[in-house]
Each structure stands twice: as C-alpha cells, then as structure tokens.
Amino acid sequence: MATTKSFLILFFMILATTSSTCATLGEMVTVLSIDGGGIKGIIPAIILEFLEGQLQEVDNNKDARLADYFDVIGGTSTGGLLTAMITTPNENNRPFAAAKDIVPFYFEHGPHIFNYSGSIFGPRYDGKYLLQVLQEKLGETRVHQALTEVAISSFDIKTNKPVIFTKSNLAESPQLDAKMYDICYSTAAAPIYFPPHHFVTHTSNGATYEFNLVDGAVATVGDPALLSLSVATRLAQDDPAFSSIKSLDYKQMLLLSLGTGTNSEFDKTYTAEEAAKWGPLRWMLAIQQMTNAASSYMTDYYISTVFQARHSQNNYLRVQENALTGTTTEMDDASEANMELLVQVGETLLKKPVSKDSPETYEEALKRFAKLLSDRKKLRANKASH
C-alpha cells in the first residue's frame, strides 16, 4: 500500500510539472521502460529486437542501437538486466549487446540461472550462476559509464528504502556509482527466488557505503514506467541539451513501456472459499501474482490518463500481453519448451491491435515510434552541428 501511495504522489508531482504550452518543434525526451518478470523477459526482448531492426532500416545503419535513440532507459528485475545489456559499453564504447542478442542470452543462461538449489529453507535458487554470468558479461563497468541515462531500481532491506541507480544522481550521491553487475543482480534478487545481495562502494573522499539489496520490483512493483518518467523529467530540467524546453509538456515526451505479460484476463482466479484455506506461503505467492497484475494495470492507467489529458496519447505506447496461460505465466520456467512459447507470445503480440478501439497493431505502432525516434535523433544532430 505504501508503494502504491508513493507512486500516486510521484505521478501527480510529474503531472504538476507539465503545461499545456506547445512543444518546441522537434525537441523531445525519449524514454524506454522495461518491466520485471524473470524468464518472461523474453517477451520484451522480442519487441526490442523488432524495434532495433526498424531503427536500423529507417536510418540505413546496421550498427544502430537502442541506446543511440533513448534519453532514458529504465528497468526493474529482468528489465534491469535488459537495460544493462543495451547500455553497458564494450571496448569500442558501443553497447556490448544488440537487441537480437538478448533472446539467445536467455536460452543459453536461463536454465542455469533457474536451476533449483535443493534447499527447503532458503531461496529457491542460490543465485551463484546469475552473479557469475553478470560479472563475466558486464565486467567492472559502473553506472557513470552507461551509454545513456539509466534508471534501475532496487530495495535496501537494511535501510528499508528504495535505491535508484541513475547517472544523473551521481553528483549528489556518488556512492551510487556501483558496478553494473552488482546492480543487475540486486534488481533481480526477487524474495523467495534469489538471495539478497550485499556489496559496498567507495567514494573518492574515502567513504564506504554498504548495500543490502533485493528485487527492484519491491520498489516499483514490477513496472518502472513512472520511475523512468520521473528521471526523464529531471533530465529535461537539468540537461542543457533540453534548454529549449521551458516547462515539460507531454507533447515533448515519448514513452515506450514494455511488459513481460500478465494473466490479468484471469487465467488464475480464486474464490473467497478457496483463499480461506490458504496458509502464509500460499498467500505470499498469490499476493505477489495479484500485486504484479494490479500494479501493471494501474501504472498504465495513470500514465495513459495523463498523456490523453495533454492530447499526447500517441506519444505513449504500452506493449503488454494480458492473457498469458499455462507455463508462460511462470517467471522461473526456463525449460526450452516454455522459452519457445514465450518467443511465440512476443512474435504474436506484434500482430495484435494496440487496443480494442484502434486497428493499429503493435508492429505498426513500433514502426511509427521508430520513425519518431529517428527524426528526433537527426534533428538533434543537425542542431549540434550548427
């Protein structure tokens, strides 16, 4: 409940900063937000692969990457992992992973990450392989080296406060310049599934800071879109590149929010009679499912309401499958058969209409977004050259 209240407060703070003034022609803050969901991250990975392919086609550049087009990329849990993969630089200062590399990553490493530890008292998985592969892939890279602004959430169980890792916060909170592999493990350390993560950072003045972190979904309830928007709002206010924006208007904001699928069409429903027989563990699992589904719906509702009120509904796109069934609803079923089903879910989702009231498919909407992202990037490059 407290998390929901904080979301509402943040939402209305963002709303209060907007105005109905016309946007400066061509200037736009672009935001990508990716939900949590374990192995279901395959679904947004399919969407990202399609979008990056469209950007490469529109700009006739096979080396185009998502980080070249988005001012803010935010994620929680598996969405935080995707965020790191597409923003962490390689030795050539380019993203170490293209969008097309993400699904193969899940197929190669998912079965080892979600390999039952055998413990009946501790977490379902020991997390050792996950941490190992993150260290191998992300190396010693820290937040400040990300190729664009990031927003990755976690929750500190010692201070009982959310921890948000962003580049823009480092000047006032240098202790947050953590290694990306520590951040990625922390945001993915879902209670029950993985152990919490402890690490320390050291600032230039010799201070040491301790972190005891769990899944970012504890802080953002699975959907980090509001968090990503708040970071984008701050970026627009503080970054000289956006000096032409006097007061942020939603005509100047482009938000793409990717879900990992829900069963909110009620494949799993319960009656009061059934729930009356549940013990604490059964309630914990059910509450997690219910909370994730409800928060995903409500966050989308909050944001879409604001964009519509500002006559900017075409600047917000939520890509979500709301009718997962069977094994595809499970965040930790990394069997090859289930991962293949998740690929099919993502590919089928592209062909579905964005809403019941619109004939536009997600594929068509993403092509439209790719054109907007390309135009905005070219305009900014032209301004910079003059």
UniProtKB/Swiss-Prot annotation:
Q: Name one GO biological process term.
A: defense response
Q: Place the motif GXSXG on the sequence.
A: 75-79
Q: Which GO terms describe its cellular component?
A: vacuole
Q: Give the EC number(s) listed in the UniProt record.
A: 3.1.1.-
Query: What residue range is the signal peptide?
Result: 1-23
Which UniProt key words apply to this protein?
Glycoprotein, Hydrolase, Lipid degradation, Lipid metabolism, Plant defense, Signal, Storage protein, Vacuole
Query: SUPFAM superfamilies in the record, alphabetically?
Result: FabD/lysophospholipase-like
Q: Which residues form the active site?
A: 77 (nucleophile), 215 (proton acceptor)
- Glycan-modified residues: 115
Write down the superkingdom of origin: Eukaryota
Motif, DGA/G: chain positions: 215-217
Which Pfam families does the UniProt record give?
Patatin
Listed transmembrane segments: none
The UniProt entry, under PROSITE patterns, shows:
PNPLA
| Molecular function GO terms recorded | monoacylglycerol lipase activity; nutrient reservoir activity; phospholipase activity
Further information:
Patatin have a dual role as a somatic storage protein and as an enzyme involved in host resistance. This tuber protein represents approximately 40% of the total protein in mature tubers.
Q: What is known of its domains?
A: The nitrogen atoms of the two glycine residues in the GGXR motif define the oxyanion hole, and stabilize the oxyanion that forms during the nucleophilic attack by the catalytic serine during substrate cleavage.
What is the name of this protein?
Patatin
